[in-house]
């Protein structure tokens, strides 16, 4: 039988009580958000006639998600991260700010505290038996389009199994493997030697993949490399590049692929190029320049503060 009680005074009063709106104390913003989200969920239960069994399956699911530390993985899978980017893009458009280098999601796997160097860094420790050398370099430009020395370029990516150091279930990787901060040189350039990453897949037995299965969706990301770029007088840029040609480039479960962020990995076998780049054999090269945007009235109006692992 279908009953409709959501719009009764009883239920509406109850929502205010449960959200603390009839109480002194607490945090008004939290009350406002909880009241709205709770109301939307109560209404969904009524509209969709969600059963008690379905509801309790959801509660058990949330417990599992937390126990597996996967809330930050499900979030991009359900598009929240990309939606927040779309909102920031729209805010920028309304302010007339052009992002020559598009932003895209941070993902849940950044770790603060990576080794820092000027101009160049070797990112991998040479231990990945399937590693194919990658030389990745480019120039950071300021808001006027001039090369920007002394910008901080933080780069992180996965190994050839798609695992990130500090989050690697095999325990094979050393701390900060394939995580570096490079300060741009006097020409605004950064350069790293590393290995080509592989695409990433959600833990196959985890709760994120379990829900994606119910949606008929896969949990794969294309091979990608993350960036934070920050510099005085500029807004911090959070983005990623995708290695062109990956089967998931335009089918990313986390919806991070954007026009302008797909970069060719050009293969070099020529002995001259091998020598000039100081590598041992054939290697791939990717070139990616990034352009920053100015602070807005002296502040970074879009900097994201979120809990991050720091080592
Ligand atoms: C996820 C993993 C990533 O490497 C990433 O960049 C974004 C999201 C994830 O597991 O959700
Ligand atoms: Fe990632």
UniProtKB/Swiss-Prot annotation:
Q: Where is the signal peptide?
A: none
Q: How is the cofactor bound?
A: Binds 1 Fe(3+) ion per subunit.
Query: Which SUPFAM superfamilies would you find in this protein's record?
Result: Aromatic compound dioxygenase
User: According to its UniProt record, which cofactors does this protein need?
Assistant: Fe(3+)
Q: Which residues bind catechol?
A: 164, 224-226
Which is an annotated Pfam family here?
Dioxygenase_N
What terms describe the molecular function in GO for this protein?
A: catechol 1,2-dioxygenase activity; ferric iron binding
Provide a GO biological process annotation. Answer: beta-ketoadipate pathway
Please tell me where Fe cation binds in this chain: 164, 200, 224, 226
What is the catalytic activity of this protein? catechol + O2 = cis,cis-muconate + 2 H(+)
Look up the record and name the pathway of this protein: Aromatic compound metabolism; beta-ketoadipate pathway; 5-oxo-4,5-dihydro-2-furylacetate from catechol: step 1/3
Q: Which InterPro entries match?
A: Catechol_dOase_N (IPR007535), Cchol_dOase_prob (IPR012801), Intradiol_dOase_C (IPR000627), Intradiol_dOase_core (IPR015889), Intradiol_RC_Dioxygenase (IPR050770)
Look up the EC number in the record and give it. 1.13.11.1
Which key words tag this protein in UniProt?
Aromatic hydrocarbons catabolism, Dioxygenase, Iron, Metal-binding, Oxidoreductase
Assembly, per entry:
Homodimer.
- What is recorded about the protein's domains? Contains a helical zipper domain, consisting of five N-terminal helices from each subunit, which forms the molecular dimer axis.
In the record, the note on similarity to other proteins reads: Belongs to the intradiol ring-cleavage dioxygenase family.
Q: What is this protein called?
A: Catechol 1,2-dioxygenase
Source organism per UniProt: Acinetobacter baylyi (strain ATCC 33305 / BD413 / ADP1)
């Amino acid at each position: 039988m279908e009953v409709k009680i959501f719009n009764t005074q009883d239920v509406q009063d109850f929502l205010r009580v449960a959200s603390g709106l009839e109480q002194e104390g607490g945090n008004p913003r939290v009350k406002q958000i909880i009241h709205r989200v709770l109301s939307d969920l109560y209404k969904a239960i009524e509209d969709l006639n969600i059963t008690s069994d379905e509801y309790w399956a959801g509660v058990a699911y949330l417990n599992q998600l937390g126990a597996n530390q996967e809330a930050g993985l499900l979030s991009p899978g359900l598009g929240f991260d990309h939606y927040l980017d779309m909102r920031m893009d729209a805010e920028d458009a309304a302010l007339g700010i052009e992002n020559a280098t598009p932003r895209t999601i941070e993902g849940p796997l950044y770790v603060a505290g990576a080794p820092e160097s000027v101009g160049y860094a070797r990112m991998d420790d040479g231990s990945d038996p399937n590693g194919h050398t990658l030389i990745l370099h480019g120039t950071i430009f300021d808001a006027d389009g001039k090369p920007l020395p002394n910008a901080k370029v933080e780069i992180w990516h996965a190994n050839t199994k798609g695992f990130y150091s500090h989050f690697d279930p095999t325990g094979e990787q050393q701390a900060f493997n394939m995580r570096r901060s490079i300060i741009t040189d006097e020409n605004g350039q950064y350069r790293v030697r590393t290995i080509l990453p592989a695409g990433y897949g959600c833990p196959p037995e985890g709760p994120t993949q379990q829900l994606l299965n119910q949606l008929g969706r896969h949990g794969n990301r294309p091979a990608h490399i993350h960036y934070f770029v920050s510099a005085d007088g500029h807004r911090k840029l959070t983005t990623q590049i995708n290695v062109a040609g990956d089967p998931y480039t335009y089918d990313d479960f986390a919806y991070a692929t954007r026009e302008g962020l797909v970069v060719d990995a050009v293969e070099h076998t020529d002995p001259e190029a091998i020598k000039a780049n100081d590598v041992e054999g054939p290697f791939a090269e990717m070139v990616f320049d990034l352009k920053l945007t100015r602070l807005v009235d002296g502040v970074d109006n879009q900097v994201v503060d979120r809990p991050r692992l720091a080592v």
